[in-house]
From Swiss-Prot:
It is an enzyme of class 2 (transferase). This is Hypoxanthine/guanine phosphoribosyltransferase. Homodimer. Its main location: cytoplasm.
Length: 185
């Protein structure tokens, strides 16, 4: 996890209105994603999940995708993507998402009530994305085995967990202090 932590410490921070936003390859694709850092993150995720407890990986567009794809390839488990645009397929579920800097809609396809899911995402900030996705998965009736985010910058993670009814496993916890990323663990 050394590579992941070091790369986070060096991540630039910009302001989106009043919201401090860190820029990192695994959360933004900028600069380019170092395969060693991605592998580091995937190895850490594998340590905190039970790989026999789910049959499908779910990743949220956009930056949950590199993590989800790498996990899918490593574990040889199928992956589905929660998209930001509709396809109009039978069974598609739309949820409304609100983050610290935007609002939008997410569209869930290729999940059924028979699925047991591993939900992965790049970062937890406000909890808006995870909350919306979990609500949609609950509507479908699928089971959630684990929820894992690579980077947690939410100081109130327990409130998000209480709201969604699941523990959120995190790989690295950070905070933004004086315009810089501080790794907490």
């Amino acid at each position: 996890m050394k590579l992941l932590k070091e790369s986070l410490k060096n991540a630039p921070v910009i302001m989106k209105g009043n919201y401090p936003y860190f820029i990192h390859p695994l959360t933004d694709g900028i600069p380019e994603i170092d395969p060693a850092v991605l592998k580091d993150a995937v190895n850490e995720i594998i340590k905190v999940i039970d790989i026999d407890n789910f049959d499908k990986i779910v990743a949220v567009e956009a930056m949950g995708l590199p993590i989800g794809v790498a996990l899918s390839m490593e574990l040889t488990k199928p992956m589905t993507v929660i998209r930001k645009r509709p396809y109009g397929l039978s069974g598609e579920v739309m949820v409304e998402q609100q983050t610290g800097y935007s609002k939008g809609k997410l569209y869930i396809n290729s999940i059924s009530s028979q699925d047991t899911l591993l939900l992965v995402d790049d970062v937890l900030s406000t909890g808006g994305t995870i909350t919306a996705v979990v609500d949609g998965i609950k509507k479908i009736g699928a089971k959630i085995s684990d929820i894992v985010v690579v980077v947690n910058k939410n100081r109130n993670i327990k409130e998000v967990e209480q709201k969604i009814g699941f523990k959120i496993k995190t790989i690295v916890n950070i905070e933004i202090v004086d315009g810089k990323v501080k790794v907490l663990d």
